[in-house]
């Protein structure tokens, strides 16, 4: 895989790793997320509640910030377990880029995003909600037709995934 490249998207927000950390608006952050695809081709997404620091009451990806000193895989595993109660293995890295966005305090700041993807052999009933209003598999047509209020990062990333060869492969018979 090549080194991450810079991309610009508008309106993406971020939260701090913890209350004592410098907020992501003031530093570079590493963000590890995943997209699981079920047998119907539906995507596992999180509906954030009104208390979320990032994109309240919007739909987003499962995952979050990798803590200082934590490696990417451990950060993803921790975030997924905290949010869904799931243990994930065998995912493939689909997206690995540095994304510049507002509301960073400087144009020299950007977040490094990694998104892992894979087929899911779980259902909504297997999810143990640890964060947000709900985490469920969502019909991709709801993303395409705009009927879900997506967070800015999700609005930027998920349509690209749905148009990718990777999504086509994951939704083909035998995946």
Q: Where are each of the predicted segments found?
A:
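Conserved Nudix-box catalytic region and its N-terminal flanking loop in Nudix hydrolases
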Residues: 42-82
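Acidic, metal-coordinating catalytic segment for phosphate/diphosphate chemistry
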Residues: 2-35, 39
């Amino acid at each position: 895989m090549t080194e991450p490249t810079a991309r610009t998207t508008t309106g993406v927000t971020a939260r701090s790793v913890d209350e004592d950390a410098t907020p992501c608006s003031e530093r570079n952050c590493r963000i590890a997320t995943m997209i699981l695809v079920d047998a119907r081709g539906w995507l596992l997404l999180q509906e954030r509640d009104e208390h979320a620091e990032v994109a309240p009451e919007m739909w987003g990806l499962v995952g979050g910030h990798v803590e200082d000193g934590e490696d990417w895989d451990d950060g993803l595993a921790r975030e997924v377990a905290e949010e869904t109660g799931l243990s994930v293995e065998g995912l493939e890295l689909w997206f690995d880029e540095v994304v510049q966005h507002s509301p960073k305090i400087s144009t020299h700041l950007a977040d490094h995003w990694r998104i892992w993807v894979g087929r899911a052999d779980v259902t909504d009933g297997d999810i143990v909600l640890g964060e947000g209003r709900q985490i469920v598999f969502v019909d991709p047509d709801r993303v395409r037709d705009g009927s879900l209020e997506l967070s800015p990062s999700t609005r930027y990333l998920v349509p690209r995934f749905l148009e990718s060869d990777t999504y086509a492969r994951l939704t083909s018979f035998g995946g």
